Amino acid sequence: MGDELIEVTEEQTLTREAAAARLRALADQLARHNQVEFVRDGLRYTAKVPAEVTLSVEVEIGDDGSEIEVEISW
């Protein structure tokens, strides 16, 4: 695949508890397996994650809506 960029974006409406469960599952992949797996177009991809990463957390609170953005990069 060389230097091809693979980007997966997913957005869905969930309950707060279901969203927390998705975040826990992602955290478990990082902590236990040192990687993140995802499926795109029927193919399974694995992103290996090094021992040290950069974590960015952004919280926006507004009258018309609020959001939390979490980004992990390496």
Predicted regions and their residues:
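Extended, compositionally biased eukaryotic interaction scaffolds
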Residues: 1-16
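Solvent-exposed loop and beta-edge segments used for protein-protein assembly and interaction
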Residues: 28-32, 49, 62-64
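C-terminal edge-of-domain segments
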Residues: 53-74
